[in-house]
A protein has these predicted regions:
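Short, structured "edge-of-domain" segments at secondary-structure transitions
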Residues: 1-215
Length: 215
């Protein structure tokens, strides 16, 4: 199936067969009936048995099986994510990861969740820590006052982190320099901001240390 998530956090799954193949250079086809202020921000292919882990700006984690995401047509808007999980008032989803399994012991103990906050804090936790869901979510990160969770990525333990700042600077380092922590930990300094009042992390991506593609 194809899972789409919009800028305003509307989500749906659609049968892959609705996206027919077209010739290169064509006009494409309409993929959503989003409102003017909304647009498709994420689109990926998954199986119905994959898991979606959602992370909120206050540091909580919720998960859904892909088959429990409401099915829609290619042009439908989808359902608001906050209607599918028990978000606290004032909290909102900031990041997500698509996970193929949470039952394979080897996979969940050798893959990691990397989180970054706006104030430059980074945290690494084994995927195993997120393999037992609760209806009201679980703590993924203890967010310090004045900060919020920004980005999350799934890694294999050997990738490199690239954090970009609003000031135009960026830092790259191997994830092996960040030790795994428990879910309740608040993380460690990943990058020092140029100015605590005006600078902030705007993006975190995880890259293959031997990769040669452009970022």
């Amino acid at each position: 199936v194809v899972v789409t998530i919009s800028h305003l956090n509307y989500i749906k799954r659609t049968n892959l067969s609705e996206y027919r193949r077209q010739s290169r250079g064509g006009k494409g086809s309409k993929g959503s009936d989003a409102r003017d202020e909304d647009f498709i921000e994420h689109l990926f292919v998954a199986t119905n048995h994959n898991y979606m882990l959602f992370f909120t700006e206050k540091g909580k984690c919720f998960w859904l099986r892909v088959f429990s995401i409401p099915e829609g047509t290619k042009t439908s808007k989808g359902r608001a994510i906050q209607n599918l999980i028990n978000l606290e008032p004032g909290d909102k989803v900031k990041a997500f990861i698509n996970v193929p399994t949470l039952s394979d012991e080897d996979f969940i103990n050798n893959n990691y969740v990397i989180m970054a906050t706006k104030k430059g804090i980074i945290k690494k936790t084994t995927l195993e820590a997120y393999s037992r869901p609760r209806q009201n979510g679980i703590i993924a990160l203890t967010v310090r006052e004045g900060d919020e969770l920004l980005s999350v990525c799934l890694t294999n333990g050997q990738q490199e982190m690239l954090m970009a700042l609003r000031s135009g600077r960026a830092i790259r380092f191997n994830e092996s320099t960040v030790r795994p922590m428990g879910r309740g930990a608040s993380g460690v300094r990943g990058v020092t901001l140029a100015d605590e009042e005006t600078d902030e992390v705007v993006s975190l991506i995880c890259v293959d240390p031997n990769g040669t593609s452009d970022i």
